[in-house]
Amino acid sequence: MIKIGIYGAKGRMGKQIEECLKSETQAQISILYDKGGNLGELFEKSDVIIDFSSPSGTHELLNYARTMPKPLVIGTTGLDEKILHLMQSASEVMPIFYATNMSLGVAVLNYLASKASQMLRNFDIEILEMHHRHKKDAPSGTAMTLAQSVAKARNLELEKVRVSGRDGIIGERSKDEIAVMSLRGGDIVGRHMVGFYEDGEFLELNHTATSRATFAKGAIKIAIWLSKQEAKMYSINDFLGI
């Protein structure tokens, strides 16, 4: 049995992973860690660690991991360039999987959106993400991943073409513009839509998550897989083989 440590155990995702691991046949919980816990114990007792914490928590985890390398599955969103660089550096001595969304369906959505962006070059692109009222960051990490993918498919720099809102008399939409809009309300687990619009027709690719168990089960499958991999950075595409 693979021993999985949950980093950020008191959060919504941490609790969901704990619940899903109770019925898992290939893995079990080694330790539940939250802020103020013993990092040394977390690393000593775990074969692999799943992180759904906060940017500061992930930063602390990566710094400690250099002293005791273990496979890390990181699903924390809102990470800045400094943390992403630290993650890349740490992957030289341990396998690290990073994704803004652990859903296999979202991974396929990202793949299809990239292909559609390439094939429908004259179509306008708009992205909408919807989440529960408690989500702290916007746009979601998944929406930004989707935006990066469709921009890259057209050889565009996302920072130069992204729009995060529209208000007032702003003029016509520019050709390369990629809008990323956020909606917050109720208990929506997660919905992402990538739309491609042209005169006379449009295509909308949608993914809706109805339970956090979707992400938790995905993270557990990835953790089991990652425990057998060599040191490097991995993405959801590596896991799916696409």
From Swiss-Prot:
GO molecular function: 4-hydroxy-tetrahydrodipicolinate reductase; NAD binding; NADP binding; oxidoreductase activity, acting on CH or CH2 groups, NAD or NADP as acceptor
Annotated binding of (S)-2,3,4,5-tetrahydrodipicolinate, by residue: H132, G141, T142
List of residues binding NAD(+): G8, A9, K10, G11, R12, M13, G75, T76, T77, A99, T100, N101, M102
PANTHER family: 4-HYDROXY-TETRAHYDRODIPICOLINATE REDUCTASE 1, CHLOROPLASTIC-RELATED, DIHYDRODIPICOLINATE REDUCTASE
Record keywords, A-Z: Amino-acid biosynthesis, Cytoplasm, Diaminopimelate biosynthesis, Lysine biosynthesis, NAD, NADP, Oxidoreductase
Job of this protein: Catalyzes the conversion of 4-hydroxy-tetrahydrodipicolinate (HTPA) to tetrahydrodipicolinate.
A single Gene Ontology CC term: cytoplasm
Pfam family, one: DapB_C
Family: Belongs to the DapB family.
Main location (coarse class): cytoplasm
Domain of life from the UniProt record: Bacteria
Catalytic residues as annotated in Swiss-Prot or TrEMBL: H131 (proton donor/acceptor), K135 (proton donor)
Pathway: Amino-acid biosynthesis; L-lysine biosynthesis via DAP pathway; (S)-tetrahydrodipicolinate from L-aspartate: step 4/4
Stated name of the protein: 4-hydroxy-tetrahydrodipicolinate reductase
Localization per Swiss-Prot or TrEMBL: Cytoplasm
EC number from the UniProt entry: 1.17.1.8
Swiss-Prot/TrEMBL catalytic activity: (S)-2,3,4,5-tetrahydrodipicolinate + NAD(+) + H2O = (2S,4S)-4-hydroxy-2,3,4,5-tetrahydrodipicolinate + NADH + H(+); (S)-2,3,4,5-tetrahydrodipicolinate + NADP(+) + H2O = (2S,4S)-4-hydroxy-2,3,4,5-tetrahydrodipicolinate + NADPH + H(+)
Enzyme class: oxidoreductase
Gene3D superfamilies: Dihydrodipicolinate Reductase, domain 2, NAD(P)-binding Rossmann-like Domain
Organism: Campylobacter jejuni (strain RM1221)
GO biological process: diaminopimelate biosynthetic process; lysine biosynthetic process via diaminopimelate
